[in-house]
Amino acid sequence: LLLLALAMFCSYIFMDILSPIKDLMQETRGWDSTAFGTMQGSEVFLNVFAFFLIFAGIILDKMGVRFTMVLSAVVMLIGACIKWYAVDESFMGSGLEAWFTNHLNYIPVFEELGVSPFYAGMPASAKFAACGFMIFGCGVEMAGITVSRGIVKWFKGREMALAMGSEMALARLGVATCMIFSPFFARLGGQVSVSRSVAFGVVLMCIALIMSIVYFFMDRKLDAQTGEAEEKDDPFKISDLGQILTSSGFWLVALLCVLYYSAIFPFQKYAVNMLQCNLTLVAPDANSFWAKPDVTIVQYLIMLFVAATGFASNFQKKAGAKYGLLCVSILALVTYCYMGYMRQSAESIFAVFPLLAVLITPILGSYVDHKGKAATMLILGSLLLIFCHLTFAFVLPLFKGSAIGGIAIAYITILVLGSSFSLVPASLWPSVPKLVDAKVIGSAYALIFWIQNIGLWLFPLLIGKVLDKTNPGVTDPTQFDYTAPLVMLAGLGVAALLLGFVLKVVDKKKGLGLEEPNIK
C-alpha cells in the first residue's frame, strides 16, 4: 500500500507541476489562459477520445496489477520527459518549435465545437507540452485504476475503504508538495526558469518507476510465499461491458464522479492564480527572513509533520495518544498557516488543501467500512463543494484590501474544500465492488475513470476560455476576475448534489448496499 501510495504521490506532483506558476508561464512563454487551460486539459485527451483508458482496464484484467503498474510508470516518465523539453529554453528557436508553430493549427470537428486540443495562435511550446501531457495522462490514469484494483485484491472484505482513503490521502500530499516546490525551483537563485520545475517533476517520475518495480518484485515474492498465483480476472468479453452499463447504480456513481472531480481537479490548476487575483499579497523584503529559500524547506517539513501526526492519530487505540497527536497536528497546522501569511505566498496558502484530507480521510474510510452511509457522504461532499466555490466567487473578493481577513477566509475555505474532497474517495470508490461482479472490477473502474476524464479534459479548457472572455484586455496575470469560472464550478456541485439524492433513493429501492458497511 505504501509503495503504491508513494508512486501516486510522485504522479500527483507532476500532474499539477505548472499550476502554481501559471503567471510565470504567461510572462516567460506567452501562454494566455486559453493556452494554459488547453494544455492542462490535454492530460486526459487520449484517454477520452482514443479510449486508451478502456484498453488500460482490459490490460489490467488480462495482465494483472504488477505488470500494469510498471507499464503505467514507464508511460508517465516518457510523457514527463517530452513536457520538460517543451518548456525548456533549448526548445525555443529549434526546428521542432518551428514545426509546431506551422502545424496542428486546425483540428476538424473539435475546432467547430470550440474545444480543440490545438488551435492557430497556440504557442508551440504549449502544443508540444500538450503532446507530452497526453502521454503522461495515459500512464497516470492507468496507474489510478491499477492502484484501486491492487487495493481491492488485498483488502476486499476487510478495511477496504480505510485502505483506499489512506492511499489517496498520502498521494494527495503530492498536491501540496507541488504547490510549494514548483515556484521554489522556478525562482531558485533569483532567475526565473520554468523548466527547472518540470525537471523536478521528471526526477520524481523516475522515483515512481523505481517504486513500481520494487512493488512488482515484492508482490511476486509474497505470492510465491503464500502459494497463490497473481489474481487476474476472467478474459475480457464485450458482454462484460453490457453487464456494467446496465447497472443504474453504476451510472449514478460514474456521473457523480465526473461532476465532483470536474469541480476539483480543474480548479486546482487555477487555484494559485485565483488567490493571486483575489488577495492583497505584498512580497516580503528581499533581505528579510521570510524571503529566504530555507523558509520554504522549513515550511514544507512542518507540513509533513502536520500530515504525519494527523494521520497517525487515526490509528491510536488509547484516547490520550489519539487526542495528543491531534492537538500537536493542529498546532503545527496553525504554525504552517502563520508562515504562509508571513511569506505572502499564494502557493503556500493553497498547499493546505490536502492537509485536512490527510487527517480525516482515514476516519471517513473507517466509518464507511464499519457503519456504511457512503451515499450520504457523497451528498455532504457536494454541499461543502458548493459552499466553497461560492465563497471564493463572492466572499473572498470583498476582503481584497484586508491583509489578514482575506488570507484567513482563504485558509478556512481551502481546508473545508479539502475535507469535502475526502468524502469522495472514502465513500465512492469502495462502493464500486458492490455494483458490479468481481471479475469485471478492473473494467468498471476504467469506465468510471473514462467518464470522469471527459470532465477533466473539458473543464480546464472551459475555465481558460471563460477567463479570457470575461477579462478582455487584461494582460497582468494577477488581475483576472474569477467570478464566472467559480460559479460554473459551483453549478457542477449543485448537479452532483441532486444526483446524490437520486442515488440514495435508487439504493433504497434496489438494495445496492451503498449505505451498508463494507465489513459485516
Spans of features found by a protein language model:
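Extracytoplasmic gate region of multi-pass secondary transporters
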Residues: 18-22, 247-312, 332-357, 361, ...
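Central cavity-lining transmembrane alpha-helices of secondary-active solute carriers
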Residues: 41-58, 351-364
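Cytoplasmic membrane-interface "Motif A"-like loop-to-helix N-cap segments
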Residues: 61-73, 316-324, 369-383
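Flexible cytoplasmic inter-helical loops of multi-pass small-molecule transporters
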Residues: 99-100, 216-240, 510-519
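Cytoplasmic helix-loop-helix junction between adjacent transmembrane helices
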Residues: 126, 132-170
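Helix-loop-helix hairpin linking two adjacent transmembrane segments in secondary transporters
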Residues: 167-220
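C-terminal transmembrane helical hairpin of 12-TM major facilitator-type secondary transporters
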Residues: 328-340, 345, 351-356, 374-428
